[in-house]
């Protein structure tokens, strides 16, 4: 599994509802690997927005192929949101190497 993470700040005077309306994709791509996307606001700083996308059943080698399909949609989305948020301070894709339930004993 891969995880895409993005951190940015809502601009002064912009609330999350306004951002979300502009952020929603204007086109759905069948087979988009980002099947679960979580957006969260920092509880201590509600202008700090963190977005995580879970990308299941994907290999890092697949990134160029699906980015080629998604780029036109993402470019349009960027044009809609760029005046609402700062440039990302984090924008990366990570490969999951462990998954743990910290409410249970963990065995090596």
What are these model-derived regions, one by one?
Residues 93-108:
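Acidic/histidine-enriched, glycine/proline-rich intrinsically disordered or flexible terminal extensions
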Residues 40-46:
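A short beta-turn/loop motif at secondary-structure boundaries
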Residues 12-13, 46-47, 56-61:
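Short, charged/polar surface micro-motifs in flexible loops or helix N-caps
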Residues 1-9, 50-52:
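Active-site-flanking beta-strand signature of metal-NTP-handling nucleotidyl enzymes
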Residues 24-38, 54-92, 107:
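An amphipathic, aromatic/His-enriched active-site/gating alpha helix that lines ligand/cofactor pockets
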Residues 36, 47-50:
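Short, surface-exposed coil-to-beta transition loops
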Residues 9-20:
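Short, surface-exposed ligand-recognition loops at beta-strand->loop->(often short) alpha-helix junctions
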């Amino acid at each position: 599994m891969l995880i895409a993470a993005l951190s940015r700040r809502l601009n002064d005077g912009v609330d999350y509802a306004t951002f979300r309306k502009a952020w929603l994709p204007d086109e759905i791509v069948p087979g988009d690997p980002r099947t679960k996307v979580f957006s969260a606001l920092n509880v201590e700083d509600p202008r700090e927005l963190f977005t995580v996308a879970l990308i299941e059943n994907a290999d890092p080698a697949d990134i160029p192929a699906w980015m080629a399909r998604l780029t036109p949609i993402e470019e349009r989305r960027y044009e809609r949101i760029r005046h609402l948020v700062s440039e990302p301070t984090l924008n990366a894709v990570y490969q999951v190497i462990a998954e743990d339930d910290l409410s249970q004993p963990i065995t090596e």
